[in-house]
Curated annotation (Swiss-Prot):
It is found in: Cytoplasm. Disulfide bonds: none annotated. Belongs to the endoribonuclease YbeY family. GO terms for cellular component: cytoplasm. Its cofactor is Zn(2+). Zn(2+) binds at residues 130, 134, 140. This is Endoribonuclease YbeY. The gene is ybeY. HAMAP family: Endoribonucl_YbeY. One of its GO terms (molecular function) is metalloendopeptidase activity. Single strand-specific metallo-endoribonuclease involved in late-stage 70S ribosome quality control and in maturation of the 3' terminus of the 16S rRNA. Its EC number is 3.1.-.-. The keyword Cytoplasm applies. Keywords: Cytoplasm, Endonuclease, Hydrolase, Metal-binding, Nuclease, Ribosome biogenesis, rRNA processing, Zinc.
Amino acid sequence: MYIEMIDETGQVSQEIMEQTLDLLNFAAQKTGKEEKEMSVTFVTNERSHELNLEYRDTDRPTDVISLEYKPETPILFSQEDLAADPSLAEMMAEFDAYIGELFISIDKAREQSQEYGHSFEREMGFLAVHGFLHINGYDHYTLEEEKEMFTLQEEILTAYGLTRQ
């Protein structure tokens, strides 16, 4: 999986960047998404607040914002078009590969790791996997959806070795 990592805060250690990259690749393998692309941006609470207001109309910072990429209009080309211009097939594959972007608030991750009594590394991993599952179509609006998503989330984190202890 190709993952673009951006640290807008200047506060994310190389270890956390590498853990996030490794964990998301692990999650991609577990969910059959190895051929996909996404981005992860680490932000402050202030930036998280702005994004939450812009995309979710919620006037407060949040821990992770998941923006699933869904093309509004499918790009369709005829076989003649594809034969005449092979770059069209490459372009279609690129659009199909990109699944979305995550914005993880470093400030919220620190607050929540203390609140829940586990490591910052575990909280960062939790937020990355939680957001990853959202941009892959998982949600928790109903009890059934919540059970499915949270079970898979915990399975991934446990198999990776990021437990709550």
